[in-house]
Amino acid sequence: MVETLLEVRNLSKTFRYRTGWFRRQTVDAVKPLSFTLRERQTLAIIGENGSGKSTLAKMLAGMIEPTSGELLIDDHPLHYGDYSFRSQRIRMIFQDPSTSLNPRQRISQILDFPLRLNTDLEPEQRRKQIVETMRMVGLLPDHVSYYPHMLAPGQKQRLGLARALILRPKVIIADEALASLDMSMRSQLINLMLELQEKQGISYIYVTQHIGMMKHISDQVLVMHQGEVVERGSTADVLASPLHELTRRLIAGHFGEALTADAWRKDR
């Protein structure tokens, strides 16, 4: 029996804004939700803009403090601000590597920084791990001396993946990480991520609006709307028999129909 790797219990986020001298407005960006993630499992979180999916991803990665709820990984609680502990277990890939990678640092510096900050590895050990990680994502050892702007778009996203992998995490969160790539590069990165999942035992949480991509990479899916989960289940079941109107609309917008067993096998 595969044990639960990540457990999310009643996690929520409410933003409070000052709208005047004596007035405040609250927005429930993420209403209390719960889910679990197993080893080597991929969970897709889909929804329209403003559904709360990116806010949820940032709470999981420790970038935003939850208003309420609990996070546990391997039965160990995660607390906001525990960056070193969390970053060795949960890492994130961002949508636009051009803005998330420091343009003034060489690739060697970008990958070395998390190792210096979160491990006790000696310089030579860090160098070996950097080279090994670059090879894992299809980059050459010679690329260590490059700056991000010297890489092609697909290579930049491979670097983003390498930065996520450098601490050998158990969970990688990808927030629309492949959305900006063309279909060929996107397919290459998907295949690479699936290969790494099999070899390294990584679990993914993939945040996306691209329901076609979700079909190919995810085992389970959460559908979010206005901060709450309106549908969940195995990807095959949700796509074949959607229950919520939003899910039906998203599927119809991409595939033109719910995915029956025959339609599932078609390459749309």
UniProtKB/Swiss-Prot annotation:
GO biological process, one term: peptide transport
Domain ABC transporter, residue spans: 6-251
Phenotype when the gene is knocked out: Loss of resistance to protamine.
Residues reported in the UniProt entry to bind ATP: 47-54
Predominant place of localization: membrane
Subcellular localization: Cell inner membrane
PROSITE patterns per record: ABC_TRANSPORTER_1 (PS00211), ABC_TRANSPORTER_2 (PS50893)
Membrane topology: Peripheral membrane protein
One Gene Ontology term, aspect cellular component: plasma membrane
Induction per the UniProt record: Part of the sapA-sapB-sapC-sapD-sapF operon, RNA detected in mid-log phase cells.
Protein name: Peptide transport system ATP-binding protein SapF
